[in-house]
Amino acid sequence: MSRFWSPVVRTLSPYVPGEQPKQDGVVKLNTNENPYPPSPRVLAAIASAAERLRLYPDPRATRLREAIAAYCDVAAEQVFVGNGSDEVLAHTFPALLKHDRPLLFPDVTYSFYPVYCRLYGVAHEEVPLDAAMRIEIADYRRPSSAILLCNPNAPTGIALPRDAVAALLAENPDRLVVVDEAYVDFGAESAVPLVAHHDNLLVIQTFSKSRALAGLRVGFAIGQRPLIEALERVKDSFNSYPVDCLAIAGAVAAIEDEAWFLESRTRIIASRDVLTRDLAQLGFEVLPSLANFVFARHRRRSGADLAAALRQRGVLVRHFKKPRIEDFLRITVGTDEQCGRLIEVLRELI
């Protein structure tokens, strides 16, 4: 701590990302990264774009916005891109979520949301998930300025169907609904088709998970034009060039190679099903996930003890020391070999 810290900094509890190990040979199942590499076309596009590094990137990332728009069947002016979906979220809070009434989001969800609230001074209320760790739409019928949902939810992996999101929008025409769809490509239904009918919907997605571009940092939002304009106004008051030319080139190439994307996604979903079965056979309760991870707890072993024991044996999973979920482990769906090693170690421990 320094005497030069502002009052805001003194009260912050920053987000803590998953561990990035320095040593080789670790089975890394703690940060929900894609276990498979990006498309070779992505690597070729990045190499080709390197010669333009002396130039500033397009501040509007027009080529990328047009590619996303074509893929999602929306207009380019309905797309906002940023340096990962975390930056898109970071702009969303001051642009659209800071009002007199509180923002609502689940009590068990992406832990960056309360961090952004504290950083930007956004009043918020946490709405408890039900006993099955599900979001109940009826619980959001309370005074608020906006609703923020991660769908599929993190860290549970449980998803709301599109018609439930549509019902939420219909019940709240005067409140903004933000749907964070970082994991939507692994089996859930996207809310993007609802944007055309609801001016109070903003959908946020990322290239980090299903497109295997976590190291490139590309995210985007889709909404009707006034919402996108609000994000642009905040971005241009902060940094006019958030997405670099390599990221633009790589992300466009990732969209263009649909076959690679579909193959990777299919393999992850199949591995998730096997991992869920194997964990259940070891006595774990596994929540029904539509993400690239599973959320599980053992009936006789604490989550903290299991996470520590796994780490000692070279297997990293994510444990959250938080009420209601302290006995759960969030386990990324890795390759079949990685998941097999996890199960092998768990058999030894249990």
Swiss-Prot record:
It catalyses: L-histidinol phosphate + 2-oxoglutarate = 3-(imidazol-4-yl)-2-oxopropyl phosphate + L-glutamate. It comes from Bradyrhizobium diazoefficiens (strain JCM 10833 / BCRC 13528 / IAM 13628 / NBRC 14792 / USDA 110). GO terms for biological process: L-histidine biosynthetic process. The keyword Isomerase does not apply. Keywords: Amino-acid biosynthesis, Aminotransferase, Histidine biosynthesis, Pyridoxal phosphate, Transferase. GO terms for molecular function: histidinol-phosphate transaminase activity; pyridoxal phosphate binding. The modification N6-(pyridoxal phosphate)lysine is found at K209. Pathway: Amino-acid biosynthesis; L-histidine biosynthesis; L-histidine from 5-phospho-alpha-D-ribose 1-diphosphate: step 7/9. This is Histidinol-phosphate aminotransferase 1. Its EC number is 2.6.1.9. Belongs to the class-II pyridoxal-phosphate-dependent aminotransferase family. Histidinol-phosphate aminotransferase subfamily. The gene is hisC1. It comes from the Bacteria. Its cofactor is pyridoxal 5'-phosphate. Pfam families: Aminotran_1_2 (PF00155). InterPro entries: Aminotrans_II_pyridoxalP_BS, Aminotransferase_I/II_large, HisP_aminotrans, HistidinolP_aminotransfase, PyrdxlP-dep_Trfase, PyrdxlP-dep_Trfase_major, PyrdxlP-dep_Trfase_small. Homodimer. SUPFAM superfamilies: PLP-dependent transferases (SSF53383). The keyword DNA damage does not apply.
